[in-house]
């Protein structure tokens, strides 16, 4: 199972979790066009509130796990293919269960990741695929650093 792949294999330098993160990055990048098209000029008070909550919690150097999950799920809800939503949720669950075992995230990483959420949503709302991809890269940078 994905969870066991992320948790076990102690001698593999977290290879299983890196594999999962790489698939999440690939999926997020593959969904750039549908996400930016679905959200272009779209108002959503729920996502606005989630982004504000994420930034507020991160500024206190606290984890924003619930808000993070809701953000990623809400971002994909307008897409026609709900399998994307289910895959993202499965990968998100594995990654949030296993990342604390790495001693991550560091406080400064939480702030950077919170900012990346705002950048992802801002780019999606602007319909800016290039900025969205850059924000996805920023979103995963702290996690990838913790895995190397």
Located regions from the model:
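Secondary-structure edge/capping motif, primarily at the C-terminal ends of alpha-helices
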Residues: 34-38, 54-61, 124
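C-terminal all-alpha effector/ligand-binding and dimerization domain
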Residues: 48-56, 70, 89-148
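Short loop-to-helix capping motifs
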Residues: 80-82, 127-128
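Short basic (Lys/Arg) and small-residue
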Residues: 75
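Acidic, Gly/Pro-rich loop/turn segments at junctions of secondary structure
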Residues: 12-14, 59, 79
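Amphipathic alpha-helix face/heptad-repeat signature
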Residues: 16, 20-23, 43, 50, ...
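Short, cationic motifs built from Arg/Lys/His that form the positively charged side of catalytic pockets
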Residues: 24, 28, 38-39, 72, ...
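Short linear motifs at protein or domain termini
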Residues: 1-33, 37, 148
